[in-house]
């Protein structure tokens, strides 16, 4: 049995920043994550993807962001319980007891749920025999962009992942086809602007009004992707690689059975301190839902700070928190 102040579920960027914030407030942390390494989707799905909206970083790779967040949290000696899920929750007086899938027991006064999309997997397009090409010609996640150098690539989707990867890979690919069933893209406006600028060259071709229809190839080697419009007109795109980006399937797993208010696979919280309907349990980052929610990493950072400042009196038995700036606090911790 471990005893701690705060149990953080999720070791993605928001969970890691929560470790730092808790440490600055004098709180000890244990962190639970289902993956074998810390970093969440940033490491598992897109370590090389550039992130542009982190303050003070004009551009930073997801993997590097996680490295910096881990370094920032390290002085506070968090204990990580990786490759295991939080499966059971029991309330005991002023404490919560969590049991993991490896039978680890952790007792804490506050729980911060920063589980991102929960357990995640790709939404796969309904194409015949697509599994024959997976991991060789069809990829749902990118962890090594160099394998796509000089390739003809079909990217399918209209959101941030599809648009961002089309831009990012355009420097190394021979040709990119971006297939989307609509004329408008739902990615960030600046990303769409960059996309359309590059599309004026031969590096990216926008194939709008079409959807994926079939794959053609042999021995897991893709030769072409067949797309179809609303009038059943087809077009063959010569391609070696297919990257379908249709979002993730979300699964809260055991968290859905903890008595929390859940809506559309997200945990509902108040918009002031991000506390759930159970006092002492907070949800932050992509897993949290409230009016006006923005699914951004930097928003999750702010939610981590607010929730832990609010949790201070619970952790320290009603003691009032006297606010100090980090320059003062960090000097005391050294």
From Swiss-Prot:
PANTHER family (UniProt xref): THIOREDOXIN REDUCTASE 1-RELATED-RELATED
Free-text cofactor note: Binds 1 FAD per subunit.
Cofactor(s), names only, from the UniProt record: FAD
GO molecular function per UniProt: ferredoxin-NADP+ reductase activity; flavin adenine dinucleotide binding; NADP binding
InterPro entries named in the record: FAD/NAD-bd_sf, FAD/NAD-binding_dom, Fd--NADP_Rdtase_type_2, Ferredoxin-NADP_redctase_2
Gene3D superfamilies documented for this protein: FAD/NAD(P)-binding domain
Enzyme class: oxidoreductase
Residues annotated as binding FAD: 33, 41, 46, 86, 120, 286, 327
Record organism: Rickettsia massiliae (strain Mtu5)
Similarity comment text for this entry: Belongs to the ferredoxin--NADP reductase type 2 family.
Reactions the enzyme catalyzes: 2 reduced [2Fe-2S]-[ferredoxin] + NADP(+) + H(+) = 2 oxidized [2Fe-2S]-[ferredoxin] + NADPH
Subunit details: Homodimer.
EC number: 1.18.1.2
Name of this protein: Ferredoxin--NADP reductase
The keyword Chaperone is annotated on this UniProt entry: no
Keywords noted in UniProt: FAD, Flavoprotein, NADP, Oxidoreductase
Keyword presence, Nucleus: no
């Amino acid at each position: 049995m471990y005893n701690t102040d705060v149990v953080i579920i999720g070791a993605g960027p928001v969970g890691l920043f929560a470790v730092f914030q808790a440490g600055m407030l004098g709180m000890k942390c244990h962190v639970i994550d289902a993956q074998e390494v810390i970093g969440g989707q940033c490491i598992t799905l897109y370590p090389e993807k550039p992130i542009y909206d982190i303050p003070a970083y004009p551009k930073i790779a997801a993997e590097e962001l996680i490295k910096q967040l881990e370094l920032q949290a390290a002085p506070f000696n968090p204990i990580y319980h990786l490759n295991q899920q939080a499966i059971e929750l029991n309330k005991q007086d002023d404490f919560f007891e969590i049991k993991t899938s490896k039978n680890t027991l952790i007792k804490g006064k506050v729980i911060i749920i920063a589980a991102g999309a929960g357990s995640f997997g790709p939404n796969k397009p309904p194409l015949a025999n697509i599994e024959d090409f997976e991991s060789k010609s069809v990829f749902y996640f990118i962890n090594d962009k160099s394998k796509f150098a000089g390739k003809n690539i079909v990217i399918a989707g209209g959101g941030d992942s599809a648009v961002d990867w089309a831009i990012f890979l355009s420097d190394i690919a021979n040709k990119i086809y971006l297939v989307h069933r609509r004329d408008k893209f739902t990615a960030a406006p600046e990303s769409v602007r960059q996309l359309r600028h590059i599309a004026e060259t031969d590096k990216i071709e926008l194939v709008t009004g079409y959807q994926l229809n079939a794959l053609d190839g042999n021995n897991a080697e893709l030769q072409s992707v067949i797309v179809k419009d609303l009038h059943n007109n087809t077009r063959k795109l010569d391609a070696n690689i297919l990257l379908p980006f249709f979002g993730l399937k979300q699964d809260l797993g055991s968290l859905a059975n903890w008595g929390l208010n859940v809506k559309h696979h997200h945990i509902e919280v108040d918009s002031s301190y991000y506390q759930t309907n159970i006092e002492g349990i907070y949800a932050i980052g992509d897993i949290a839902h409230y009016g006006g929610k923005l699914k951004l990493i930097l928003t999750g950072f702010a939610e981590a700070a607010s929730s832990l400042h609010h949790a201070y009196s619970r952790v320290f038995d009603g003691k009032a928190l006297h606010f100090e700036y980090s320059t003062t606090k960090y000097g005391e911790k050294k």
